[in-house]
């Protein structure tokens, strides 16, 4: 085989290998582009589950406080009042919140209310995702933060909690308990 023939063979082999490697690279890029949103959404769902766990524990602590004191805490002190009922302060931090401070707010109309005076505890919000990032923050839903897949986690007076999309979440705060 002549040297020129060997060079031509190697050029063809190199071209085939180059095209194959380029094809694999393109396939990898396309696959990554398709899978990235899937992984991002899965990570956000995991953060939502973690937030729900945090809120569930805080809601239980609020219920224990109410059972011990016959009323829910004052809105201006709710976080301080439930701290003794919680394992640690990290429960106040939502994993999806922009700042590492309190990610939740107390529903102000419940301040110093007896749970028995609330006609439908399963329909009245008690704790919700808040954009304020302050301990002991309370309002009437104005700071509601839709940080979980365009929705919010809301805990109710009866202790259950749920993720709500924007329109449904905001509607919960239109009625007074």
Predicted regions and their residues:
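Residues that flank catalytic or metal-binding motifs in active/ligand-binding sites
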Residues: 51-54, 78, 90, 100, ...
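C-terminal accessory segments of extracellular proteins
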Residues: 8, 127-177
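Extracellular/periplasmic catalytic domains that process cell-envelope and extracellular macromolecules
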Residues: 84-88, 111-121, 145-148, 155
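Membrane-embedded alpha-helical segments of small multi-pass membrane proteins
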Residues: 8-34
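Solvent-exposed helix-loop boundary motif
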Residues: 87-106
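Active-site-proximal beta-strand/loop segments in catalytic clefts of secreted hydrolases
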Residues: 61, 68, 94-97, 128-130
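Conserved hydrophobic/amphipathic alpha-helical signal-anchor segments
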Residues: 26-91, 161-174
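Juxtamembrane low-complexity tails/linkers enriched in Ser/Thr-Pro and polybasic
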Residues: 1-7
């Amino acid at each position: 085989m002549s040297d020129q023939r060997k060079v031509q063979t190697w050029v063809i082999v190199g071209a085939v290998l180059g095209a194959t490697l380029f094809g694999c690279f393109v396939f990898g890029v396309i696959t990554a582009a398709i899978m990235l949103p899937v992984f991002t959404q899965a990570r956000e769902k995991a953060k939502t589950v973690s937030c729900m766990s945090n809120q569930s524990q805080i809601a239980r602590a609020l219920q224990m406080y109410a059972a011990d004191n016959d009323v829910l805490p004052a809105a201006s002190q709710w976080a301080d009042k439930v701290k003794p009922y919680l394992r640690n302060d990290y429960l106040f931090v939502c994993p999806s919140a922009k700042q590492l401070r309190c990610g939740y707010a107390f529903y102000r109309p419940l301040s110093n209310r007896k749970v028995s005076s609330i006609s439908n505890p399963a329909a009245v919000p008690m704790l919700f995702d808040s954009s304020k990032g302050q301990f002991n923050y309370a309002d009437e839903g104005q700071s509601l933060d839709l940080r979980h897949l365009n929705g919010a986690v809301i805990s109710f007076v009866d202790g259950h909690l749920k993720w709500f999309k924007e329109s449904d979440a905001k509607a919960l705060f239109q009625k007074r308990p």
